[in-house]
């Protein structure tokens, strides 16, 4: 297989599964973490290696290292692997997903932005999500429904949220939250962007939109489960509800995404007696302002590209300490208000609208 984003948390866990099951790694793509990448190259001996830029490429111990987005797309086209694992962060993952689809590859997808930006143009039958929530839904639905929930007696799908690092903070304290505060996730160890997205609840907005495309339904909602051991639930027409429970470890969804069949123990089971009580909370708009647009986003999924672009802009400015944490949500909501009537008819529209939203954000904020 080919692993895009090999030095991030998903990529590292993917290679751990590859190591365990002796899966050949044809290609590695990474950003600028050259030390981890060099160790991966030494162990897995890939045929292709691509990094973000020339500066990083000069530090890579590989005779024919390439750099840049075009090199990633070219590698996908040249590769003989059937499976592409896309664990790139943010918009960098969109074109590789489209290229992999064009080449008829199977895609193990951890890059949320691909479906958020361009879900209507992606054949989800070739995609397996690397995501605890969507994996949980798939696990609950696969036997009974063949994944498409409209074809069986599903009443509603639910995914859970941790609530992020500021979950137990007062509204007044949230206004003063620093980057260091926001990155202290209570349950998961993740990258910077997704940890911020967890704190704003943008991550869960994206996951609802992903679920819409993956499971072909608008009957999807979310709530907070504070221990993050229940990842997804299915509410059935007969009144019963089933839940997917597992530890907070991405190796389980990764294993199912990259292996045709999983019979081994990937994780030890959750000991429910040790867990004790579980706590469920409503996602409050007062604490998570972006939740205000949840229903609108499902009705008008073209807005996904607006939310994503405004969010990426806002996170950049937050990381530069030029805006506050609560400004992230404010910028997103104002962008949605400005571009509410956006209409995407082709993949080129996605990139045009991204540019338009980005320019608007740059001229109106900071």
From Swiss-Prot:
Keywords from the UniProt entry: Isoprene biosynthesis, Manganese, Metal-binding, NADP, Oxidoreductase
Residues noted as binding NADPH in the record, renumbered to the chain: 7-10, 31, 33, 111, 113, 191
EC number: 1.1.1.267
Database matches in Pfam families: DXP_redisom_C, DXP_reductoisom, DXPR_C
A GO molecular function held by the record: 1-deoxy-D-xylulose-5-phosphate reductoisomerase activity
InterPro entries in UniProt: DXP_reductoisomerase (IPR003821), DXP_reductoisomerase_C (IPR013644), DXP_reductoisomerase_N (IPR013512), DXPR_C (IPR026877), DXPR_C_sf (IPR036169), NAD(P)-bd_dom_sf (IPR036291)
Names of the cofactor(s): Mg(2+); Mn(2+)
Recorded superkingdom: Bacteria
SUPFAM superfamilies named among the record's database cross-references: 1-deoxy-D-xylulose-5-phosphate reductoisomerase, C-terminal domain, Glyceraldehyde-3-phosphate dehydrogenase-like, C-terminal domain, NAD(P)-binding Rossmann-fold domains
Residue numbers binding Mn(2+): 131, 133, 207
Keyword hit for Transmembrane helix: no
GO biological process, one term: isopentenyl diphosphate biosynthetic process, methylerythritol 4-phosphate pathway involved in terpenoid biosynthetic process
Entry binding sites for 1-deoxy-D-xylulose 5-phosphate: 112, 132-133, 162, 185, 198, 203-204, 207
Pathway assigned to this chain's UniProt record: Isoprenoid biosynthesis; isopentenyl diphosphate biosynthesis via DXP pathway; isopentenyl diphosphate from 1-deoxy-D-xylulose 5-phosphate: step 1/6
Catalytic activity: 2-C-methyl-D-erythritol 4-phosphate + NADP(+) = 1-deoxy-D-xylulose 5-phosphate + NADPH + H(+)
Keyword Metal-binding: yes
Function of the molecule: Catalyzes the NADPH-dependent rearrangement and reduction of 1-deoxy-D-xylulose-5-phosphate (DXP) to 2-C-methyl-D-erythritol 4-phosphate (MEP).
Name by which UniProt lists this protein: 1-deoxy-D-xylulose 5-phosphate reductoisomerase
Organism: Nautilia profundicola (strain ATCC BAA-1463 / DSM 18972 / AmH)
Gene: dxr
């Amino acid at each position: 297989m080919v692993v895009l984003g090999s030095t991030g948390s998903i990529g590292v866990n993917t290679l751990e599964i590859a190591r365990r099951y002796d899966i050949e790694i044809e290609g590695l793509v990474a950003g600028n973490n050259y030390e981890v990448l060099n160790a991966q190259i030494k162990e897995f001996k890939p045929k292709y290696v691509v990094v973000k830029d020339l500066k990083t490429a000069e530090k890579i111990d590989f005779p024919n290292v390439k750099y840049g987005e075009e090199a990633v797309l070219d590698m996908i086209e040249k590769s003989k692997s059937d499976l592409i694992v896309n664990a790139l962060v943010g918009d960098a993952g969109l074109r590789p997903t489209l290229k992999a689809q064009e080449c008829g590859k199977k895609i193990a997808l951890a890059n949320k932005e691909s479906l958020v930006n361009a879900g209507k143009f992606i054949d989800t039958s070739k995609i397996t999500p690397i995501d605890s929530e969507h994996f949980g839904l798939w696990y609950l639905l696969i036997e009974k429904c063949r994944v498409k929930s409209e074809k069986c007696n599903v009443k509603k799908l639910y995914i859970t949220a941790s609530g992020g690092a500021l979950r137990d903070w007062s509204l007044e304290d949230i206004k003063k939250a620093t980057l260091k505060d926001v990155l202290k996730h209570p349950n998961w160890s993740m990258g910077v962007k997704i940890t911020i997205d967890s704190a704003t609840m943008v991550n869960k907005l994206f996951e609802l939109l992903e679920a819409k495309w993956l499971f072909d339904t608008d009957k999807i909602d979310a709530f907070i489960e504070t221990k993050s051991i229940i990842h997804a639930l299915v509410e059935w027409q007969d009144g019963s509800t089933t839940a997917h429970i597992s530890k907070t470890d991405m190796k389980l969804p990764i294993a199912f995404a990259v292996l045709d069949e999983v019979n081994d123990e990937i994780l030890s089971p959750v000991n429910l007696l040790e867990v004790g009580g579980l706590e469920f909370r409503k996602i409050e708009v007062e604490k998570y302002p972006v939740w205000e647009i949840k229903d609108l986003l499902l009705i008008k999924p073209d807005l996904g590209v607006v939310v994503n672009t405004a969010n990426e802009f806002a996170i950049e400015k937050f990381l530069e300490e030029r805006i506050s944490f609560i400004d992230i949500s404010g910028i997103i909501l104002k962008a949605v208000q400005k571009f509410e009537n956006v209409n995407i008819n082709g993949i080129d529209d996605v990139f045009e609208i991204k540019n338009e939203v980005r320019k608007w954000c740059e001229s109106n904020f900071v």
